[in-house]
Each structure stands twice: as C-alpha cells, then as structure tokens.
C-alpha cells in the first residue's frame, strides 16, 4: 500500500529507562524555558540520557528556517529573534545539573546575518565562566558556508566540533535539499586544518543508501580529517517525513563500526539507537 510505514522489528523496541534525575531535568528545563534537541527532535535515547543526568541543549529556539525531510523540528522562514538571556540560562542549567560534559546544538537560522554564530559564542563563554571544568561539544549547522561565522564559533575552541553529513551524497536532493555534502566536508576540514579541533560527524542509515555508499562517505570523512563517527537508524518522525526504506539489522551496524575503525576513526558509535550526541564525552 502506498505510504504504508514499515513495522518496527524487535531490536527497535526500546525499553523505557528512567531514574530520579529524569524528573529533575524535566522540571529544570520547564522552569527555565530551555529547549533540548532530546525533546524537539524526538530522540529515542531521551530517557537514558536524562536518567544519566545529561542533555543536549538546543540554541536559537526550536523552529528552523530549513525543512530537511528527516527532521522532526518545526520549520518557519522567519522565527522569533534569539533570546539574549538564553546563554545565561543555559549556563545556569549546566551548573544546576552538575554536568561534566555539555553538548550544544542549534536550529539553522538563515534569517540572521551571522546564522546565530554570535549567540553560539556567547553561550559557550557563559558555560565556561560558570562551569570551567565542563567539557564542551558543539554540533553546529553549516552557517550557509559563511567562513566568518564558522571561525567565530571555532575560535572558542570546543573540545569537539561536530557537524553531521547526515546521509550519502546521492540522497541529498531528496533528504537534505538546502544543504551541500561537499560544504559539510569542507567545514570539518576547516575545523581541523585551520583550528586544530577534534572533529566528529554522524550519519543516518535506512533511507535507501547502500552499504558501499556509507563506506565511501566514511572515507570522505577521513579524508576531511574527521576522527569520530556516529551511525544510527533513521526513524521517520511523522507520515509526512521521508519514509524509512528499511530497518538496518544490528549486525550491519557492527560491520559499519568495523569498517570505520579499520579506516582509523578513533571513536565509533554505531547502532540502531545511536544519535549524534549519544555517549558524548565518554571518549574524553
């Protein structure tokens, strides 16, 4: 039947895990009106990460100026202006949560002259001022390839600079039409070559790519100097999003991990539920 969604296999039936920290974080985020990608992107690891006392903060609101067909975050051409108090609120939440490692990400803000880069730097500075011992990973957008905006963020020297290629180049037109595969690779190369940053990227599988295409993209990432990799199963957020072509079995994720480690990636997280920030900081 056209439009029929695939039935999830047994290995994708996640057992909910919650601890006392889960409720504490939920209350804190509600009280401070902060956004997390955990909730906005419907991450399957939300319960696990929150129960471990970690979260990924979503900067610049929860509405994106782009409409990637895989993403659950809402889209709008002219979102509300950035909240100038958000950097301080996030820094306060990091302190209250006693985080040892912080992950920051953001929506695309193509409506802003700098894509939100200054807001990024203000948030990073605020966190480092209030929690100087906390590690910091930044999962950045492409800033439309604006070198000045990219350098503004990279000059703050996060411990890890993460930028996802998301999928193989053949699928970009249908999955990520407002982005460029080669531009994403150049961002990772810039972070390492010009700034000496540890770089990381992530891919989703199950969208129609072949095993060989994923391996080829891994090679592209290594050529760009990327040393850390995440690979996870694409899960269709709603019926209107890009359909799942297939559910990749666990043993295929193991094969991806072996291929990546053989290429020289220092850290590889590969599995059905893996997402960009899954176990972030565990390799630090």
Swiss-Prot record:
It comes from Chlorobium phaeovibrioides (strain DSM 265 / 1930). Pathway: Protein modification; protein lipoylation via endogenous pathway; protein N(6)-(lipoyl)lysine from octanoyl-[acyl-carrier-protein]: step 2/2. [4Fe-4S] cluster 1 binds at residues 38, 43, 49, 277. Keywords: 4Fe-4S, Cytoplasm, Iron, Iron-sulfur, Metal-binding, S-adenosyl-L-methionine, Transferase. Its EC number is 2.8.1.8. The lineage of its organism: Bacteria, Pseudomonadati, Chlorobiota, Chlorobiia, Chlorobiales. It is an enzyme of class 2 (transferase). It is found in: Cytoplasm. Its cofactor is [4Fe-4S] cluster. Disulfide bonds: none annotated. It catalyses: [[Fe-S] cluster scaffold protein carrying a second [4Fe-4S](2+) cluster] + N(6)-octanoyl-L-lysyl-[protein] + 2 oxidized [2Fe-2S]-[ferredoxin] + 2 S-adenosyl-L-methionine + 4 H(+) = [[Fe-S] cluster scaffold protein] + N(6)-[(R)-dihydrolipoyl]-L-lysyl-[protein] + 4 Fe(3+) + 2 hydrogen sulfide + 2 5'-deoxyadenosine + 2 L-methionine + 2 reduced [2Fe-2S]-[ferredoxin]. InterPro entries: Aldolase_TIM, Elp3/MiaA/NifB-like_rSAM, Lipoyl_synth, rSAM. PROSITE patterns: RADICAL_SAM. GO terms for cellular component: cytoplasm. Residues 50-266 form the Radical SAM core domain. Belongs to the radical SAM superfamily. Lipoyl synthase family. This is Lipoyl synthase. Binds 2 [4Fe-4S] clusters per subunit. One cluster is coordinated with 3 cysteines and an exchangeable S-adenosyl-L-methionine. It holds the Pfam family Radical_SAM. [4Fe-4S] cluster 2 binds at residues 64, 68, 71. One of its GO terms (molecular function) is 4 iron, 4 sulfur cluster binding. Coiled coil: none annotated.
